[in-house]
Amino acid sequence: MAEVRASRVFQRFARFMSCGLLGWAPALFMYYARTLVPLLEKHPDLHLPFDGSVFTAFTINFGPRTVCYPHRDVKNLAFGWCAITALGDYNWRTGGHFVIWDLKLVIEFPPGTTILIPSAMVCHSNTAIGPEEKRYSFSMYTAGGLFRWVEHDFTPEKVYQETRNRAQAVVEGRERWESGLALFSTLAQLRGGTDKTTDKTEGDNI
């Protein structure tokens, strides 16, 4: 993994994938960036896998014929996005399609293509490729536990929940879900430049 992190190719992938989040969900991007500031101040021994990216973790599927079965990434931030880049050499018209089951979408996914999805929300997979073809994938994401750790003032989840009764927990859960969805952007907001955030200071410092 040290070689991957040192690779200029993967460094560029990581920055591009982070910029994809900024371009399509700028308010969500800023939520990631603002969470990183206190997290890294509290834990200076932690280091992001790639400079210039707000994602804190990555996974590489080395294949050589990577196929993901239908799943949800339930440990990621519930309303967070995962960036996935397809790599390899395969006929993308006949295989390697990206499938979003909840939306009944089957998407052509050529090598070098990046997609961003709320991977904890939607069930997703990809289709098989030919026996002589090769397919790999590079994904970036952030675990939901890191956001809870910061928002609960660096208190373990079990200890934090002991300070709340059931009614409070239900209200907090509903409010968190609603505030998370509010970080998504509509196409009208993106086209009109009327998104909820304009301050990119933290993001510029990642």
PLM regions with names:
Residues 1-139:
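Active-site-proximal segments of catalytic enzyme domains
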Residues 79-80, 89-206:
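Catalytic core of Fe(II)/2-oxoglutarate
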